[in-house]
Amino acid sequence: MSAADANQLQESLEKLNLDSAPAAAEEEAVAAESAPAGEEGADSANVAESTASLYVGELNTSVNEATLFEIFSPIGQVSSIRVCRDAVSKKSLGYAYVNYHKMEDGEKAIEELNYSPIEGRPCRIMWSQRDPSARRSGDGNIFIKNLHPAIDNKALHDTFSTFGKILSCKVATDDMGQSKCFGFVHYETAEAAEAAIENVNGMLLNDREVFVGKHISKKDRESKFEEIKANFTNIYVKNIDLEYSEEDLKKLFTPYGAITSIYLEKDAEGKSKGFGFVNYEGHEAAVKAVEELNDKEINGQKIYVGRAQKKRERMEELKKQYENTRLEKLSKYQGVNLFIKNLDDTIDSEKLEEEFKPFGTITSARVMVDETGKSKGFGFVCFSSPEEATKAITEMNQRMFFGKPLYVALAQRKDVRRSQLEQQIQARNQMRMQNAAATGGIPGQFIPPMFYGQQGFFPPNGRGNAPFPGPNPQMIMRRGQPFGGPEQWPRPGPNGQPVPVYGIPPQAYSDFNGQNIRQQRGYYPNRNQNKGRQQRDLAAIIASAPPDQQKRILGEELYPKIVATGKAQEPEAAGKITGMMLDLDNQEILALLEDDELFTNHFEDALTAFEEYKNSEAAAPVAPAAPAEPQA
């Protein structure tokens, strides 16, 4: 487009009221206000004629008013254009309204531009129907199915336009733009629709026999569904011998009544797939065939015979069956199924059952294992009664078993556990905010232990000083990571200060002492030196640590994870949020550390509480400063 053309287009757009073309709901109000009382029938048509409003559909979301003006303005003088957009996101809904001053220009636009590509996608143009009753009326609307995938909107329009004036025409497509092999044609008159049904129904279009009939709204179809269901004539047959032909199937079902059609599903090679359909003339014959032939053994295998169902109906029934089975299973095991964790790796299902057998009758016991058969450290034991399960919880929870304290509780679904944790932390956040309002601050700030040394080096011992102490929660690595490179230890805290982490096994201590001098000079231990050494499980560490140290250990795990989110920007934010989250039970904190999604949810709640506190603190009135005393 030349510069002159661009300037002319810009000037034309400025003259247009691009927002004056009302959307569908607004159009109805405009039409209603324009028509005088008592003359609605004739005058509503006059309003439509005077505005010459066109609906333009199937548009790309990138199409805007300027693009449409460039396409439609050569036809005639455009009065207004509007691309309809989402009220919130302002993204195009894929359709627009173009208004001409003259009716002739609108007709010409439909003739010349309908189904023409706009940004690579064929558009669909029709007269705007402002009367909702006319749009929703079934008169003149027909439904076509079993269309060839190659038939698009234009091909469908060209095929059916010979029977009368078409108001709208559309082939249904999926999200990828592929045809669903059915479509709709809306004629101006019911007579044209009847003519199309009479002439095209049963015809071959692109070597496919199509069905053409009156369009029935979804509401009407669903209201008639129960009636059709109760008077079915079509039956489904499966588990048929693969050697059976349609003729054999006909001989089997003919004794029960007159058959209108038989269909046996076959593969690409023409071989039977073992199922098919039989349609009777009357409902009684279909019912009799189902009663007589269902589960009947033919050629050594039982066949299934039942009422034919649509895919949607089958899916709904299967979903209901699954839900009923799930609820039945939940009620069956409610209060009797126990969850046991912190099991030693040597414990198998037999040992677990043997340990819990004294408390009652066990219906099942299982230790969960991975793909290699190695224990995951937890399992389930199901008793025959809730009383036995309660006794087992009372006696076995926190009992030492193979050197590890067991955690025993009633088994819960994952979604239930997550919901409970979320409710607990929300309740605690509310209590914290109330306490903060009462005391003037957020309680429970966690101050992580820090070393103030040169950034990038380990804390120096100094010449002649004693080496670092033994395994200390303030001086050891995160669990599950080898003792290695500079990015692992010390981890950066606020202002670039290194923050100690947790998890060095005791056996690494000898190597640690021997490397102090090298560490002071900027050297780091070999990554692979301690490779293969197992780290102690954090849950076991917490269980074996003194009560006054447990929260500190967990805090050293939470703090770097909170810092790593990058959302705790203020210097004190990470410490205060860590303090909030440390108010949770130890088991809840362990769950947060294991589940990133759960951690994120609780962190966001705590961050919101902290920000609300800061905002309320900032909004509080500040006492005026005392005037400065004059200096001598």
Curated annotation (Swiss-Prot):
InterPro entries: Nucleotide-bd_a/b_plait_sf, PABP-dom, PABP_1234, PABP_HYD_C, PABP_RRM1, RBD_domain_sf, RRM2_I_PABPs, RRM_dom. One of its GO terms (biological process) is regulation of nuclear-transcribed mRNA poly(A) tail shortening. Residues 1-43 are annotated as: Disordered. The keyword Cytoplasm applies. Residues 52-130, 140-217, 233-310, 336-413 form the RRM domain. PROSITE patterns: PABC (PS51309), RRM (PS50102). Its main location: cytoplasm. Binds the poly(A) tail of mRNA. Appears to be an important mediator of the multiple roles of the poly(A) tail in mRNA biogenesis, stability and translation. In the nucleus, involved in both mRNA cleavage and polyadenylation. Is also required for efficient mRNA export to the cytoplasm. Acts in concert with a poly(A)-specific nuclease (PAN) to affect poly(A) tail shortening, which may occur concomitantly with either nucleocytoplasmic mRNA transport or translational initiation. It holds the Pfam family MLLE. Residues 1-11 have a biased composition (Polar residues). Belongs to the polyadenylate-binding protein type-1 family. GO terms for cellular component: cytoplasmic stress granule; post-mRNA release spliceosomal complex; ribosome. Coiled coil: none annotated. PANTHER family: RNA BINDING PROTEIN (PTHR24012). Residues 31-43 have a biased composition (Low complexity). Residues 534-615 form the PABC domain. NCBIfam families: PABP-1234 (TIGR01628). The lineage of its organism: Eukaryota, Fungi, Dikarya, Ascomycota, Saccharomycotina. It is found in: Cytoplasm; Nucleus. Keywords: Cytoplasm, mRNA processing, mRNA transport, Nucleus, Repeat, RNA-binding, Translation regulation, Transport. This is Polyadenylate-binding protein, cytoplasmic and nuclear. It comes from the Eukaryota. GO terms for molecular function: molecular condensate scaffold activity; poly(A) binding; promoter-specific chromatin binding; ribonuclease inhibitor activity.
